[in-house]
Design a protein with these regions (language model features):
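A generic structural motif
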Residues: 88, 144-147
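Electropositive, beta-rich accessory/interaction domains or terminal extensions
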Residues: 1-122, 131, 166-180
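Loop/turn positions that initiate beta-strands
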Residues: 101, 151, 155-157
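Basic (Lys/Arg-enriched) interaction patch that binds polyanionic ligands
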Residues: 156-165
Length: 180
């Protein structure tokens, strides 16, 4: 398991459905090491902290394994890392294998998986299609949020290590299936 890309974004104001909407969903790959703290990654911004960010959603991880299917389904062969607003594009961490409560070492930081990402209107706005929210949920390719148990730093190429798991805890996919 490893980090393929660390992605950061600044808040933008974007016209959507007749009004200006603020969002930090547009993420770009960062270079070098990035500090990870209790409220997220240094240099990353969220416009609506009631829905995104905060201690329980400090870091959003998304499997790179989902990108080929999205590129084909959306007709976007150049879809790049961070496209879904994730902070960490990761390899080897799938919703069917990751459990709520899993503790992971990512770079020098430690995170605890808290919940799946449930899509919001900002995802539809980013892709210019409100139906994207429904497509994302139906795909069950949600990615997942984590809280930060130990501050540290992370960079592309860092190994991800499972430090602890409660095997009785549901997988991220189990939770998505219950909510979908």
């Amino acid at each position: 398991m490893r980090v393929v890309s660390v992605n950061l974004g600044r808040i933008r104001e974007v016209p959507w459905r007749g009004r200006l909407v603020r969002s930090g969903i547009w993420k770009e790959p960062a270079t070098g090491r990035v500090r990870v703290g209790s409220l997220g990654l240094e240099g990353d911004e969220q416009a609506d902290r009631a829905v995104h960010g905060g201690a329980q959603k400090a870091v959003y991880l998304y499997p790179l394994e989902h990108y080929p299917a999205w590129r084909e389904e959306l007709g976007m062969p150049e879809l790049g890392w961070g496209a879904f607003g994730e902070n960490l594009t990761c390899e080897g961490l799938l919703e069917t294998d990751v459990h709520i409560g899993d503790r992971l070492r990512v770079g020098t930081a430690e995170v605890v998986i808290t919940q799946p990402r449930m899509p919001c209107s900002k995802l539809g706005m980013k892709f210019g299609d409100a139906r994207m929210i429904r497509k994302f949920l139906a795909s069950r390719r949600s990615g997942f949020y984590a809280s930060v148990a130990l501050d540290g730093d992370v960079a592309a190429g860092d190994v991800i290590t499972l430090l602890g798991r409660n095997p009785a805890a549901p997988t991220v996919r189990d939770v998505v299936d219950e909510q979908a």
